[in-house]
């Protein structure tokens, strides 16, 4: 097999040059990190589950007219995505107080917010992805005002879709993080959902019990991460309900 050209390796994924112009192969690793990679481990099967779940969410978004970079899943660990220019922001949508918001504002975890709150962080691991305002974004030219209007609209549409989907299977969407890519169609820029949507990037709590079904299981040593992610996948029908917790590792 021809050796592929690695473009970038992050904490949870590796990007390779795609087989067709304008495409990238996104490989999901089993590495788990927390607290800006201060805590690390390898969790067998995590990459397989995140690949399948991200495919499921991205496909669902495309079906309701939300543009994404996803093209198709290639195998158990890889998907083909559209190459795009990443906007240097993490976009966070919060429905309930948790994590850094609870610490920052002194709001008890689990408190429902008056409305979905959208926050922005600068993508910079060395600085710990600091929270920034729209004033910072405009002043430093990280995104235009039109971009910000489009990003807000995309983020809230993703929230509507994911919230309803999760509620239907007994899961509360506490918050989530997305990344935005810029593509050019006939020289006209367009913003799309990029990166991934998975339990790595969402806070998901069981509505009935409050059990955490996301990366907080790893952050806070609450049990098996693959068990939690598999439970989400089973409820959504992404893997069979009778399947054992660890997926068979193929490819």
Curated annotation (Swiss-Prot):
Q: In which pathway does it act?
A: Purine metabolism; IMP biosynthesis via de novo pathway; 5-amino-1-(5-phospho-D-ribosyl)imidazole-4-carboxamide from 5-amino-1-(5-phospho-D-ribosyl)imidazole-4-carboxylate: step 1/2
CDD domains reported for this sequence: SAICAR_synt_PurC
Determine if Protein biosynthesis is one of this entry's keywords: no
Return the InterPro entries for the record: SAICAR_synt/ADE2_N, SAICAR_synt_PurC, SAICAR_synth, SAICAR_synthetase, SAICAR_synthetase_CS
Classification via PROSITE patterns: SAICAR_SYNTHETASE_1 (PS01057), SAICAR_SYNTHETASE_2 (PS01058)
Its cellular-component GO annotations read: cytosol
Is Nucleotide-binding set as a keyword in this record? yes
List the Pfam families: SAICAR_synt (PF01259)
Q: Which GO terms describe its molecular function?
A: ATP binding; phosphoribosylaminoimidazolesuccinocarboxamide synthase activity
Per the record, the domain of life is Bacteria
| Top EC class, one word | ligase
Q: What are the boundaries of the signal sequence? A: none
Gene3D superfamilies reported in the protein's UniProt record: ATP-grasp fold, B domain (3.30.470.20), Phosphorylase Kinase, domain 1 (3.30.200.20)
Q: Which GO terms describe its biological process?
A: 'de novo' IMP biosynthetic process; cobalamin biosynthetic process
Catalyses:
5-amino-1-(5-phospho-D-ribosyl)imidazole-4-carboxylate + L-aspartate + ATP = (2S)-2-[5-amino-1-(5-phospho-beta-D-ribosyl)imidazole-4-carboxamido]succinate + ADP + phosphate + 2 H(+)
UniProtKB keywords: ATP-binding, Ligase, Nucleotide-binding, Purine biosynthesis
For this protein, the Enzyme Commission number is 6.3.2.6
List, alphabetically, the PANTHER family matched: MULTIFUNCTIONAL PROTEIN ADE2, SI:DKEY-6E2.2
- Please report which protein family the annotation says this sequence is part of: Belongs to the SAICAR synthetase family.
Identify this protein by name: Phosphoribosylaminoimidazole-succinocarboxamide synthase
Q: Which organism is it from?
A: Ruegeria pomeroyi (strain ATCC 700808 / DSM 15171 / DSS-3) (Silicibacter pomeroyi)
GN (gene name): purC
